[in-house]
Amino acid sequence: ALAEIPNYQKLHRATFELVPSRPSAQFSPEEVALQPKLQDVYGILQEGFPNLLDYPIWLTDVSHRCRHGMSHVLTYRNSSTLTLVFDWKDQVLVGQVATRAAQRGSGYARDFLRWTAQWLAQQGKHAVLFALDIRISFYREIGFREIASEYVLERTDVQKEEQKKGAL
């Protein structure tokens, strides 16, 4: 069984389709940064992803994909961020969704995701994101549609500092 493979843990993951809906009246679209400083983005991500790659490796990967038009990074009020990990031929994978700890519960991420879903739909793009069990209820509450469910394996024996450039 999958759960018995040494040095791996089994995680349940759902795929959600982003469904456009209106952000709250408090949302300020002028506070969305379409080309934020990647150093600021990394600071937000560090608060939400404890196993995030070290900055030089992350920066090399993300900046390369952004320069070549494959990815886009956005922020809202320099407190929430998301990445259009792959944006290709009107198909978008959204990932690295995070909000600074001090702003969690403010509704920033919820509004930002709703705005992003509308923004992408206006461009004729179909967007999805993956969510682990702990975040599934959040995406359902936003109104995103669960379209698939699967189990993935994650290695448990590799420490962050052991990750090398080739791991990307």
Predicted regions and their residues:
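Acyl-donor-binding surface of acyltransferase catalytic domains
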Residues: 1-29, 150-158
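Conserved acetyl-CoA-binding loop-helix of GNAT-fold acetyltransferases
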Residues: 99, 105-122, 141
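Conserved GNAT acetyl-CoA-binding A-motif
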Residues: 1, 120-132
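Conserved active-site alpha-helix within GNAT-family acetyltransferase domains
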Residues: 1-10, 110, 133-150
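A short beta-loop-alpha structural element at the N-terminal edge
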Residues: 28-43
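Acyl-donor (CoA/ACP) binding surface of acyl/acetyltransferases
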Residues: 73, 78-92, 110, 124-125, ...
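A conserved beta-strand-loop-helix scaffold within acyl/acetyltransferase catalytic domains
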Residues: 52-98
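Helix-loop element at the rim of GNAT/NAT acetyltransferase active sites that forms part
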Residues: 43-55
